[in-house]
């Protein structure tokens, strides 16, 4: 029984949300939504798609977090993009290409928690490998291929057990930093069935890692698209997300032993 007990104890230390004695706090992990071969939601006029936008601006989020003294890693589950502008932006941000794209919404079991299966699991598993302090999936939202007439409700989705405070912090930052589009924004905790496509949220919960999915702006709402196409405003959005993460980090310090 002793070897089994030791394995359980080690698992709790490594994956239970704390930092093992003598270990440095892990990084903030950002994940670029989708990949070059499946770019995610796009605006009806083709001006914005999720993958291209976050290729360009994930580095801005990372830079703000690192400037505050925290380590940060940017992941993308696919291969390096062929587009030169996207590739240069990814290189500048130091994006770690995981080379395991979600082809046809294929689902993978977690290597750490195989009972949890989902698309994008490779990114969650990498965050667990890195002992991430928290994880932010950078996305843009959409309700379909037609323009919305009314302002949609922005969402900050989070894993149910651990993500609420991080989500509330990002939500508060949005209301302050991008008030013109954030008054109706809300936090949506989710518990996903183990076989569902977003089961990676449960794997991160099991690993003790707070996680949020940024889905606050919509690519099929014209005012949002106009905002996202403005470089200065897009950078403001990236800095605002970083501000929300930093506020949470300051409330949850991890001291090095």
Task: Describe each PLM feature range.
Residues 27-32, 72-76, 104, 133-138, ...:
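Structural recognition of the beta-strand scaffold that forms the well-ordered cores
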Residues 119-130, 201-206:
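Mature extracellular/periplasmic domains of secretome proteins
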């Amino acid at each position: 029984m002793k070897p089994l007990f030791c394995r359980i104890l080690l698992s709790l230390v490594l994956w239970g949300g704390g930092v093992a004695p003598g270990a440095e706090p892990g990084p903030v992990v950002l994940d670029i939504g989708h990949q070059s071969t499946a770019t995610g939601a796009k605006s009806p006029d083709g001006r914005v798609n999720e993958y291209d936008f976050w290729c360009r601006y994930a580095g801005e989020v990372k830079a703000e977090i690192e400037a505050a003294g925290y380590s940060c890693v940017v992941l993308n589950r696919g291969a390096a993009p062929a587009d030169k502008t996207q590739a240069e932006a990814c290189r500048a941000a130091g994006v770690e290409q995981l080379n395991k794209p979600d082809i046809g919404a294929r689902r993978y079991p977690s290597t750490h928690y195989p009972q949890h299966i989902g698309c994008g699991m490779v990114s969650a598993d990498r965050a667990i490998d890195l002992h991430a302090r928290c994880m932010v999936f950078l996305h843009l939202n959409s309700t379909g291929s037609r323009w919305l007439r009314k302002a949609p409700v922005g969402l900050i989705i989070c894993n149910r057990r651990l993500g609420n405070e991080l989500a509330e912090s990002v939500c508060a930052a949005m209301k302050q930093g991008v008030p013109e589009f954030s008054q109706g924004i809300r936090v949506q905790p989710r518990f996903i069935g183990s076989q569902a496509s977003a089961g990676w949220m449960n794997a991160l919960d099991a690993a003790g890692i707070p996680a949020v999915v940024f889905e606050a702006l919509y690519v099929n709402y014209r005012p949002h698209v106009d905002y996202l196409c403005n470089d200065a405003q897009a950078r403001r959005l990236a800095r605002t997300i970083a501000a929300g993460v930093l506020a949470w980090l300051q409330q949850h310090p991890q001291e090095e032993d």
